[in-house]
A protein has these predicted regions:
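Bacterial N-terminal signal peptides that target proteins for export
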Residues: 1-6
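Eukaryotic scaffold repeat domains enriched in small/polar residues
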Residues: 19-379
Length: 379
């Protein structure tokens, strides 16, 4: 069934680890709006691995901005390369493919992808339960599913060159229509049990502003908007990320509102998780807080998915959030910059099966690995 996109609503990875161990810092989480109190639990701590990935990257490859990333069951990392390289740099390097696959040690396995077929502004990817790689290019109106090695396009949802707009072009008005065509899609996830496909559709103003759900063949099923109160109706709804939790919930980055919104799988609103920040330098006379605190997210891989790992572009760090209470417990990263452990416009995040966190940077044009620091047994 479809929930109407009401005008008032105006629409609308990382991780702990699977059987991993963490240094222990006990905490008692605060009570959220839903009066849930988190149990005392160890908070993971991370340190950058300066020797990952291995260099040279491929055959002296150079990347453009990295739009997103995802990880498969072998802990192979797939990185989305936008290929917007500095042209003079090509005198000393070769352009990398749009999709780069790395093994856990940081070696390049392969590069693949046709830039024209994939589309503009590669934004997010997801590896499903059958190891297929789903790719979202935000500048298009389509979603694509590839074999794990990228050799076969298994499914395309939406028509290339068309947008879900009033005139079918990128200049038209967004329609948020009941069909499987998109307008500036941002993120994708696939329900491992049902095969249903969840798409955050509308990563920039002027595009759609909805969560769309499709069946495993790509047929439209339902949609809903980001939640807005009457007082929030002027906050532009930009669903910038989307991930499905093990307990049947949908987590969406409500970028302009600096929070994560949680829904059930039919679109019923559950709660907000605010992601705050305080500028370290006075915002007087300069832009401040414009990038957003909730840009990308991933869950810890323990069965309860105790933590959320949230890319915060305002503080330029990764926030570790207690998923039950919504409390920001700690953060890692050394703020803006290009030294190891710093970030330049981080845009994608993922976690492997042993708890290593990977962060892809758009302006930094690199991916960094953060490993669990000085682990101790986790009860």
């Amino acid at each position: 069934m479809t929930r109407a996109l009401l005008p008032v609503l105006a629409s609308i990875l990382i991780v702990g680890c699977r059987n991993a161990s963490f240094p222990v810092e006990e905490h008692q989480a605060g009570v959220s709006g839903s009066d849930v109190v988190a149990d005392p639990a160890p908070i993971p701590h991370y340190e950058v691995d300066p020797k990952w990935p291995k260099l040279p990257l491929g055959d002296r490859w150079i990347t453009g901005g990295l739009g997103g990333m995802c990880i498969d069951e072998r802990d192979h990392i797939f990185v989305l390369n936008r290929q917007d390289v500095v042209l003079e740099d090509l005198d000393g390097a070769r352009p990398a493919a749009p999709v780069i696959e790395l093994d856990p040690e940081g070696n390049v396995v392969r590069g693949w992808g046709d830039p024209e077929r994939l589309g503009d502004r590669l934004h997010d990817c997801h590896v499903d339960a059958e190891s297929n790689v789903w790719i979202v290019a935000a500048g298009t109106g389509v979603l694509q599913k590839y074999s794990n090695d990228g050799r076969e396009l298994l499914l395309q949802i939406g028509e290339t060159g068309k947008y879900d707009s009033s005139d079918g072009t990128r200049e038209g008005e967004p329609q948020n229509s009941d069909r499987a065509q998109f307008f500036l899609p941002a993120a994708v996830d696939v329900d491992a049990q049902t095969g249903e496909i969840y798409v955050a559709d509308g990563e920039l103003p002027g595009g759609n502003h909805r969560i769309a759900v499709l069946d495993r063949e790509g047929r439209f099923l339902r949609q809903w908007a980001l939640e807005r109160t009457e007082a929030e109706r002027d906050v532009i709804p930009l669903p910038h990320c989307l991930r499905l939790s093990n307990d049947g919930l949908v987590y969406v980055c409500d970028r302009r509102a600096d929070r994560i919104q949680v829904f059930d799988r039919d679109g019923a609103f559950v709660r907000n998780i605010d992601i705050p920040f305080e500028p370290l330098t006075s915002p007087d006379g300069r832009p401040s807080g414009t990038r957003g605190t909730a840009v990308a997210l991933a869950f810890s891989t323990d069965p309860q998915q105790r933590y959320l790992f949230v890319v915060n572009q305002n503080s330029v760090m990764v926030d570790i959030v207690d998923r039950r209470s919504g409390e920001v417990l700690s953060s890692f990263g050394e703020g803006p910059g290009r030294y190891p452990g710093q970030f330049t416009l981080p845009h994608g995040i993922g976690v492997d099966s042993v708890g290593n966190v990977y962060v892809a940077e758009q302006e930094g044009r690199r991916i960094q690995k953060f490993r669990v620091a000085t682990p101790t047994p986790m009860n």
